[in-house]
């Protein structure tokens, strides 16, 4: 039951897929490609396919079909086999010459029954049967044009993208984000004849939209498979309203009943809503190199958790252009290179300064092993120094091949260190520290007035100034760290000034970024009127007020702000830190905010008896394994903090951190202001 179970779980799943792909054309969707990328790498898949041709394709409507000499196809899909997915499958197969089709879905058959509205009682009677998959197998043969051809449909739980032995992400759920009070109003308006929900505290599985509920069930199915792989029976806990729905669904997941009876090990699974603390998600206090890399470098296309590393310095190409396209980028994930993987894990677990020195050490050692003419230099590590070491490998193909993974991480580091965004990181940090002091000494209106002069139109901005998206990051920081607001005349006036300034800036942008296009619902600033811009900004501030009140339903974790005194400056105390400290509190108090989710009648009876008998309820520190799942994304610094904290508070306890995505500050405005949280796109 080691923490590296997240890696073996993923690799075991991929081995089942690889057993099917020999000489096949393989179609992957983005989330499965990301799981492969972090789990075992595309090279492993290509080796399993064999043959000289590259038969790897993206699963999309315009995907190229299989030619006359390509009789076999394998589709690896992270979604329900329904609606648009089935239509794309049909179209690809109909324009191909396949005689053998395998479809692998990461969603279990039980969830397919739920999606097809099969009642729970009827589904329970079908144990061992897979009618949905069997019907699709018939359809596949029909589309191939011969009922005697071969079709297979089966489930493999490829839920995770393992970033480190103790840390994994769920790419298929990257847009899953906890609800806000404004979503409660939307839920109420969609069910006018039912009891009105008063707050997020009233939200449960019976009140959510069918799409969101089904998305949660898909996640729960994958988590149940993970617990089965780890050999544990889980006790589920939650902090936050959406986390409660997910935890309750996992605790009562019917297909897991038999597994739980026979499991030898035990584990606590604690879900936490990201919205309860967005300060940590948008803040720049994390002294971590990887956080800076994922913020500075462009995203790897189709991925949510990796970046493009420009490899041109290792080629004979020369370009003076600033914005040329990177044809064959490097990346951070080095799943099949043990040395690079060791460096990557060191970067995740060390502070910025040590991490940069570690990169230099690895480059120097690699160059020495290859007998390259290295000039040693001590002192501060500079991007130029790293580049000079990397350039040594340029004309030595063998050395390049031997250390390709390491060179990608080295280039990522050098490119980040000299990136203008990294210099700005320190500006953010300084302003955030200033804000923390101001919040303790002044009213919110004064803090907003401090921000006002920083809101500048594009014609007046220098590289030092904040872009509209960066201003949104600062606003989220301010509202999240402040917490519940006292709404008075001064606050309303200060907010109105900031709103007008922001709306004007949006109108005057030379071109709207993809995020601003989503926020304003307009694709060009030329046609964006001040009136329309102001309506969009008003909606932003509704979300900001919601974020300020996000912890209002909590009793214990009400604040992430620690006021200053004579000896200490004001500071931010992460909610995750408070939760982990509470879990491992030596006196094991019954936490009011970490809610235990009972699984069925037995637990309810226990809870009932406990009112007049001494029945101990499960506590999250009871078991040797803690799985902490942050719903809505997590930062590298937070993962390190949790790992270090558990090791110091209860040595010997294993911890696995899971989350929907790896966060950089700019992800939060997207998830908060430009994502339909209630209606995820399931493709039907």
Curated annotation (Swiss-Prot):
Domain of life: Eukaryota
InterPro entries hit by this protein: Sec1-like, Sec1-like_dom2, Sec1-like_sf
GO BP field: intracellular protein transport; vesicle-mediated transport
Annotated keywords: Protein transport, Transport
Presence of the UniProt keyword Protein transport in the record: yes
TM spans (from-to): none
Role played: May be involved in protein transport.
Similarity comment text for this entry: Belongs to the STXBP/unc-18/SEC1 family.
Protein name: Sec1 family domain-containing protein 2
Taxonomic placement: Eukaryota, Metazoa, Chordata, Craniata, Vertebrata
Gene: SCFD2
């Amino acid at each position: 039951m080691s923490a590296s179970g997240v890696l073996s779980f993923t690799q075991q799943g991929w081995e089942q897929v690889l057993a099917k792909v020999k000489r096949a054309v393989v179609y992957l969707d983005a989330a499965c490609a990301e799981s492969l990328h972090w789990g075992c790498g595309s090279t492993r898949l290509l080796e399993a396919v064999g043959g000289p041709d590259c038969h790897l394709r993206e699963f999309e409507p315009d995907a190229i079909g299989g030619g006359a000499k390509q009789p076999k196809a394998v589709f690896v899909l992270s979604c329900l086999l329904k609606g648009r997915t089935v239509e794309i499958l049909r179209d690809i197969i109909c324009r191909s010459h396949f005689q053998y089709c395998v479809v692998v879905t990461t969603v279990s058959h039980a969830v397919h029954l739920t999606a097809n509205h099969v009642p729970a009682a009827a589904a329970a009677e079908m144990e061992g049967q897979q009618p949905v998959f069997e019907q699709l197998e018939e359809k596949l043969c029909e589309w191939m044009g011969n009922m005697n051809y071969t079709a297979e449909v089966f489930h493999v739980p490829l839920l995770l993208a393992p970033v480190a032995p103790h840390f994994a992400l769920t790419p298929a759920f990257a847009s899953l984000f906890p609800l806000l009070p404004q979503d409660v109003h939307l839920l109420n308006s969609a069910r006018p004849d039912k009891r009105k929900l008063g707050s997020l505290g009233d939200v449960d599985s019976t009140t959510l939209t069918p799409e969101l509920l089904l998305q949660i069930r898909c996640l729960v199915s994958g988590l149940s498979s993970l617990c089965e792989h780890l050999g544990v029976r889980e006790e589920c806990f939650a902090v936050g309203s959406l986390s409660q729905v997910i935890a309750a669904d996992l605790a009562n997941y019917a297909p897991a009943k038999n597994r739980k009876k026979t499991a030898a090990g035990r584990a606590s699974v604690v879900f936490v809503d990201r919205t309860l603390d967005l300060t940590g998600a948008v803040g720049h206090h994390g002294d971590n190199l990887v956080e800076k890399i994922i913020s500075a470098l462009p995203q790897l296309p189709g991925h949510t958790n990796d970046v493009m590393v420009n490899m041109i310095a290792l080629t004979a190409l020369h370009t003076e252009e600033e914005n040329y396209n990177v044809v064959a980028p490097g990346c951070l994930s080095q799943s099949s290179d043990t040395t690079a993987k060791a460096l990557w894990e060191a970067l995740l677990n060390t502070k910025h300064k040590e991490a940069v020195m570690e990169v230099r050490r690895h480059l120097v050692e690699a160059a020495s092993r290859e007998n390259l003419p290295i000039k040693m230099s001590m002192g501060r590590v500079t991007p130029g120094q790293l580049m000079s070491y990397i350039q040594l490998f340029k004309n030595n193909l063998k050395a390049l091949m031997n250390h390709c993974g390491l060179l990608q991480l080295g280039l990522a580091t050098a490119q980040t260190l000299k990136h203008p965004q990294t210099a700005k990181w320190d500006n953010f940090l300084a302003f955030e520290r200033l804000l923390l002091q101001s919040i303790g000494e002044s009213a919110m209106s004064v803090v907003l007035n401090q921000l006002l002069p920083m809101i500048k139109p594009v014609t007046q901005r220098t590289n030092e100034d904040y872009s509209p998206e960066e201003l949104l990051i600062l606003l989220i920081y301010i509202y999240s760290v402040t917490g519940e607001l006292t709404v008075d005349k001064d606050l309303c006036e200060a907010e109105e000034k900031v709103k007008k300034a922001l709306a004007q800036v949006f109108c005057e942008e030379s071109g709207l970024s993809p995020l601003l296009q989503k926020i304003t619902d307009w694709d060009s600033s030329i046609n964006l009127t001040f009136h329309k811009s102001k309506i969009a900004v008003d909606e932003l501030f509704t979300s900001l007020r919601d974020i300020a009140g996000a912890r209002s339903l909590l009793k214990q974790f009400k604040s992430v702000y620690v006021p200053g005194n004579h000896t200490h400056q004001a500071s931010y105390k992460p909610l995750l830190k408070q939760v982990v400290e509470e879990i491992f509190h030596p006196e094991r108090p019954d936490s009011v905010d970490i809610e235990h989710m009972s699984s069925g009648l037995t637990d309810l009876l226990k809870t009932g008896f406990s009112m007049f008998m001494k029945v101990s309820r499960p506590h999250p520190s009871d078991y040797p394994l803690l799985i902490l799942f942050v719903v809505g994304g997590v930062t590298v610094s937070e993962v390190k903090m949790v790992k270090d904290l558990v090791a110091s508070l209860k040595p010997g306890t294993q911890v696995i951190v899971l989350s929907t995505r790896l966060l950089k500050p700019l992800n939060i405005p997207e998830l908060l202001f430009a994502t339909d949280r209630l209606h995820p796109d399931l493709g039907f």
